[in-house]
Amino acid sequence: MLIFEGKEISTDSEGYLKETTQWSEALAVAIAANEGIELSAEHWEVVRFVREFYLEFNTSPAIRMLVKAMANKFGEEKGNSRYLYRLFPKGPAKQATKIAGLPKPVKCI
C-alpha cells in the first residue's frame, strides 16, 4: 500500500497497483520517482502505449511482446530492447507496467 495525495492506494508486495482504476498521471510520476525515474516524453510514450495495450488485450505485455508491439507502432528505432532498457533500466516490461498502474506481466520474474 502507498499513500498518495492523502489516499490509500492498494498495491501488491512489489508495488504494482491492485486496482488499475486508481491510476492517474500524477500517481505515475510518484511511482516513477520511487523507481528512480524522472518521466520524459519518451517514457510517457511507452507508459501510455502499455496502458492502451492492456485496455485492448486485457494483459500487461512481457518484454518480447512489448518490443514487438512497440516496433509495429513506432518503428525499429523505439521498438527494440536497447531503447526500452535505456528508459527503464530495471526492466521495461516491469517498470513501464508498474508506472502505468497495471498488473505485473505474467512472464516477468
UniProtKB/Swiss-Prot annotation:
InterPro entries: DsrC-like_C (IPR042072), DsrC-like_dom_sf (IPR025526), DsrC-like_N (IPR043163), DsrC/TusE (IPR007453). Keywords: Cytoplasm, Transferase, tRNA processing. It is found in: Cytoplasm. One of its GO terms (molecular function) is sulfur carrier activity. One of its GO terms (biological process) is tRNA wobble position uridine thiolation. It is an enzyme of class 2 (transferase). Its main location: cytoplasm. The active site is at C108. Its EC number is 2.8.1.-. GO terms for cellular component: cytoplasm. Part of a sulfur-relay system required for 2-thiolation of 5-methylaminomethyl-2-thiouridine (mnm(5)s(2)U) at tRNA wobble positions. Could accept sulfur from TusD. Interacts with the TusBCD complex. Interacts with MnmA. Belongs to the DsrC/TusE family. This is Sulfurtransferase TusE. It comes from Salmonella typhimurium (strain LT2 / SGSC1412 / ATCC 700720). The gene is tusE.
